[in-house]
Amino acid sequence: MSTTSLQHFSHSYSPFPSSRSSNRMAQSQTSGLDTLAEGSQYALEQLQMSREAAGDGEATNSMGKPKDQYQIDNDNHHNNHSLPSFKNSSQRDPLVEARSTIRKNSASAPVRRRISRACDQCNQLRTKCDGQNPCAHCIEFGLTCEYARERKKRGKASKKDLAAAAAAATNPGQPNGSSGKEDAAMVGGHTSPDRRPTLNGRYDPAFEVPRNLNGSAQHSEASGMVGMQNSQHLPPHSQSSMGGGLEGLSLNGYNGLNDSSRPSMPVPELQSLHMLHNSHTNPRSPSSVLPHHRYNGGYNDSAYSLMNPQEPNSTSISHFRLGSSTENPPNSFLGLSPPAQSPGWLPLPSPSPANFPSFSMASFSTTLRYPVLHPVLPHIASIIPQSLACDLLDVYFTSSSSSHLSPQSPYVVGYIFRKQSFLHPTKPRVCTPGLLASMLWVAAQTSDAPFLTSPPSARGRVCQKLLELTIGLLRPLIHGPAPGETSPNYAANMVINGVALGGFGVSMDQLGAQSSATGAVDDVATYVHLATVISASEYKAASMRWWTAAWSLARELKLGRELPPNTPHSRPDAERDGDPDADLSKRHPPPLITSMGHGPGNTVINITEEEREERRRLWWLLYATDRHLALCYNRPLTLLDKECEGLLQPMNDDLWQAGDFATYRQAGPPVECTGHSMFGYFLPLMTILGEIVDLQQARNHPRFGLAFRNSAECEAQVLEIARQLDVYAQSLKEFETRYTSSLALGAAETEAAMEGSHLNHVSPSGRSSSTVESRVNESIVHTKMVVAYGTHIMHVLHILLAGKWDPINLLDDNDLWISSESFVAAMGHAVGAAEAASEILEYDPDLSFMPFFFGIYLLQGSFLLLLTADKLQGDASPSVVRACETIVRAHEACVVTLNTEYQRTFRKVMRSALAQVRGRLPEDFGEQQQRRREVLALYRWTGDGSGLAL
């Protein structure tokens, strides 16, 4: 096939009209709605008429030579032999003549200015787009402007299109002969170098790049397109379908694919890269089970059908051009749609340029700032940019204090993992995609990135997609629907290998010998992330499903037990743990810890001290939240003290992040304050709270509660818990003295003070005396804030020990408890808690230090003040009035930091009571009291009450 013939045929059939023939093509084209409404038969009629109109003027090729008459007749034969009425112009249908006349008469009509397609970003954000490339909106916000998403058609594919695809897949291509010219013309992604592609009639500046390919290069490239079939061997319906595909072909999708100056990559390379990608991802992620698809070269019913891996009959092409953009490098992402058996509750979006797997290839991708994200990149590419994912990982590990680690995000209640292990530039920790997706989801809740704040609905949409992705990657316990309500995909989503676990949607490889130790720990941490955010929302009752799954899996993995020592033949822990930056990928062997009861025998794998500490911290975090939620939702404990009496207590957070693994620590649940993190000051309080919860459950037992309340055993338990609270109070004083007086006295010895107290973990630079003094002062303030929070919760636990948790029972006072000595002691603790809250507001005005935990203790510490204000009204003491004012201020700060319904409700109740204390009685005083009672009745801590879980 000559180059001249190829160029001429490309001129006649290329979907990108040249500047010379663009006007004529615009005249012959109908509107986009007409093209979508008509079938391939109608599109073929348009093609025939445009060719006949161009027959007289275009009978010569670009070199001025007349076109071969045989070629013209042959073209007419190949394209029209299924339609006898179009063999020559004299036999045309009158309807076609009428349509042709209408098109010719409408040539002078004004061109429509309405754009036919918005860019991918504007489409996703539902923002008005000007149709340019790049568009004004993407330029303004620095977004990647692409037109690469699939153009969808209404309804299912026609039988003709499916038959054409089947024929294209079965017939081999012809490398030479006259059919090669037609093959070249049918390649929608190939354009002649002297033509300017247009975008729906508008010139696209993205295509204005130098093209230096000579004729021979174009010829070899066109002949290398294996998937384009010889039209002589296609059945008539296939010809009609492909002819119609030319007329209705969407050109938008080729902005980033059909640039002849961009590098090409053979499909074998892409397939090898795809396998490389699968080898680096978690074997349990959905993408790893997707088959290797061949890339479709036929048009079918979509301009993107060649990128649709789910097409049942597809042909392969030997070369593919990759588009590039300014923000997302040309790496990138080639057409993997969501699996066909995606769960019904996981509505993954249709393929956008970012729904495709990322290929780790130096020439096609920039350096990823945090390589730990590699397993999740293929899944999040359609949701957030790669740079934003790295920023969100930074947000997750951001500390609000430079002196001691304190998570800035309200949804990160405690650090389970080392920051350096995740953010290491070359040897990061190996993580499951589900854990990484959940971390990004948690960070996206509060990140101030422009991508999440403009428009205002962007954060909700991104967080929803990340949540669905996290659940899909986690494959959690799925409760089966009722009989007759099973969705079509339900059976496909249930990967069941055993009878015992099959009913809950859990396969044996998740908990058995096929799962990795760290993978199982990552799953528990993912459950924690999901449960924490949902607990802080208005769906508190729903969060218990996730907490229960986390507690159950932690118990099955025996996280509450210390692992046996490593085998002697392995490298000692001291040698491996001495280098915190060692190859972390080697710290996570694939087999599960069989010594915990999974798998044959009692062989013990080697596990590093970092992995052991991750297990401990995860257990203690679940242990603390179990007791905290038992108070919040009026429920019994799930994790028992007996299960973890031999488990070492978590180490100091600053030492943990620095990689300085301590060898000596106490075991069992702690009762003394030891540090600035939630494991240091909050975990001991939760140990004591667990005993109070057990005591309260025994008091409220429907059959044995009355006898227990009047027994000596109950009184002995109360005294023991009170003693433990006194021990904690003493440890709190010693903690304050140790971290305030010693730092203040040692401030002059700047270098020694900084080295001795491990306060330079944030930045090793800046060792001037002013910097050291500033950090010492910040450490002192941080210590005082921890002491204030610990003091407040300790006073609340004293109030809870009295057994009056329910606000309605307090207001009714049926047992006259308000006149007892126990009430007087509890009231003193209520005033003490309010004073501690005043100190908290001084050091932490927005209550951002521990917003997830603090709300319930602020609420329970306020019920007695509400009771006093309701009973005494204007006769209340000044200390009670000040305490009520402090509680109102604290609730207002809580509403700003972590807005929840019960805090908004109780703030209104306390404001109403405070107005009564100050003597401002409204006219409808009785109605307000009744309304206040109705509001408080929503939150009950009686025998069958559910607390905050509405």
Swiss-Prot record:
The keyword Transcription applies. Pfam families: Fungal_trans (PF04082), Zn_clus (PF00172). One of its GO terms (cellular component) is nucleus. Coiled coil: none annotated. Keywords: Activator, DNA-binding, Metal-binding, Nucleus, Transcription, Transcription regulation, Zinc. One of its GO terms (biological process) is positive regulation of DNA-templated transcription. Residues 65-78, 570-586 have a biased composition (Basic and acidic residues). It is found in: Nucleus. InterPro entries: Transcription_factor_dom_fun, XlnR/Xlr1, Zn2-C6_fun-type_DNA-bd_sf, Zn2Cys6_DnaBD. Residues 1-97, 163-247, 300-329, 561-603 are annotated as: Disordered. Residues 119-145 bind DNA. One of its GO terms (molecular function) is DNA-binding transcription factor activity, RNA polymerase II-specific. Residues 8-22 have a biased composition (Low complexity). Residues 23-33, 81-92, 302-329 have a biased composition (Polar residues). Transcriptional activator of the xylanolytic system. Involved in the regulation of extracellular cellulolytic and xylanolytic genes and in the regulation of the intracellular activities of D-xylose catabolic genes in the pentose catabolic pathway (PCP) in response to the presence of D-xylose. Belongs to the xlnR/xlr1 family. This is Xylanolytic transcriptional activator xlnR. It comes from Neosartorya fischeri (strain ATCC 1020 / DSM 3700 / CBS 544.65 / FGSC A1164 / JCM 1740 / NRRL 181 / WB 181) (Aspergillus fischerianus). The lineage of its organism: Eukaryota, Fungi, Dikarya, Ascomycota, Pezizomycotina. The gene is xlnR.
